[in-house]
């Protein structure tokens, strides 16, 4: 028994030792995490993610969280007798649906995440794109989809003030245009644009897949590291397809604007965030600008 305990303790020390150079590298640096997918629906995984976020904060990393909430929106639309509709992969967002989206993302999902982080020992503050003019939206310009927006501009003053004071900003992807009309914006897009505006060290997208796969049916074909050009070629060849295209595109845009590394990881795995940031092997796909050689 004692031998087993010693082996377990030795393994813990080894893990902490392996994490040290990464902690040193990213201490004081901003990491933007897009939290969504199945990690939001499983209570055990949800609690693990919140503890990981607090851990990042405790070791000096400056986490900024951007979240989605699609399943919760669908659930409330169903309760209210509004049938969810999608067109070209975008949620059709008429006035009634926009009210529900804002109510759910800003009033429920956001506050739950804030409460869970605070319960885990962190100091979280909830925001949406409207707060402090953080995000100014504009319509995507497609007919028949209503108040679906994209990011027109970002003002990170309120986020920087919170981060500099030791708080963890939690941001929902609802923003207003210049007339004050609320728009629903893809959370991956919001995370990428905020990461770029903050000059983040990392953008991490938590998804329901292992990462970028050469063969989407075979998890063993995971591409652990690639650069912008390789990522673009995978899209052109059709290897990156379907719902992965906008995620990879979001990563590429953020890198082109100065983010050092963008990661696509499986949020369903316990401690996925810490495994990706603080271990040599990582667990997902990291996309970097050409020539980037840091940790």
Swiss-Prot record:
Binding residue positions for substrate: 69-70, 91, 184
Site location (Transition state stabilizer): 34, 247
Top-level class of the enzyme under EC nomenclature: transferase
Pfam families noted in UniProt: AA_kinase
Primary location: cytoplasm
One GO term of the biological process aspect: L-arginine biosynthetic process
Entry's localization field: Cytoplasm
Domain of life: Bacteria
EC numbers for this chain: 2.7.2.8
GO CC annotation terms, alphabetical: cytoplasm
Involved pathway(s): Amino-acid biosynthesis; L-arginine biosynthesis; N(2)-acetyl-L-ornithine from L-glutamate: step 2/4
GO function terms (MF aspect): acetylglutamate kinase activity; ATP binding
Reactions it catalyzes: N-acetyl-L-glutamate + ATP = N-acetyl-L-glutamyl 5-phosphate + ADP
Keyword rRNA processing among record annotations: no
UniProt KW keywords: Amino-acid biosynthesis, Arginine biosynthesis, ATP-binding, Cytoplasm, Kinase, Nucleotide-binding, Transferase
Protein family: Belongs to the acetylglutamate kinase family. ArgB subfamily.
Name of this chain's protein: Acetylglutamate kinase
Biological source species: Microcystis aeruginosa (strain NIES-843 / IAM M-2473)
């Amino acid at each position: 028994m004692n031998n087993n305990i010693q082996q377990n303790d030795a393994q813990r020390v080894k893990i902490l030792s392996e994490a040290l150079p990464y902690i040193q590298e990213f201490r004081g640096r901003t990491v933007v995490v897009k939290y969504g997918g199945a990690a939001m629906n499983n209570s055990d995984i949800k609690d693990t993610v919140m503890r990981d976020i607090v851990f990042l904060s405790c070791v000096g990393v400056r986490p900024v969280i951007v979240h989605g909430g699609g399943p919760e929106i669908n659930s409330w639309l169903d309760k209210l007798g509004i049938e969810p509709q999608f067109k070209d992969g975008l949620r059709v967002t008429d006035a009634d649906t926009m009210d529900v989206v804002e109510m759910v993302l800003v009033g429920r999902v956001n506050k739950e995440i804030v409460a869970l982080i605070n319960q885990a020992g962190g100091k979280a503050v909830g925001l949406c794109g409207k707060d402090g003019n953080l995000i100014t939206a504009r319509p995507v310009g497609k007919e028949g989809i209503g108040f679906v927006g994209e990011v027109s501009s970002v003002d990170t003053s309120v986020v920087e003030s919170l981060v500099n004071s030791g708080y963890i900003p939690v941001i929902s992807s609802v923003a207003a245009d210049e007339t004050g009309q609320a728009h629903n914006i893809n959370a991956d897009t919001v995370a990428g644009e905020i990461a770029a505006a903050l000059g983040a060290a990392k953008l991490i997208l938590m998804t329901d897949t292992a990462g970028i796969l050469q063969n989407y049916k075979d998890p063993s074909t995971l591409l652990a590291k690639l650069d912008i050009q390789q990522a673009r070629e995978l899209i052109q060849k059709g290897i990156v397809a379907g719902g992965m295209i906008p995620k990879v595109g979001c990563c590429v845009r953020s890198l082109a604007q100065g983010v050092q590394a963008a990661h696509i990881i499986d949020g369903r795995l316990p401690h996925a965030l810490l495994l990706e940031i603080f271990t040599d092997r990582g667990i997902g796909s990291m996309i970097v600008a050409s020539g980037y050689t840091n940790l």
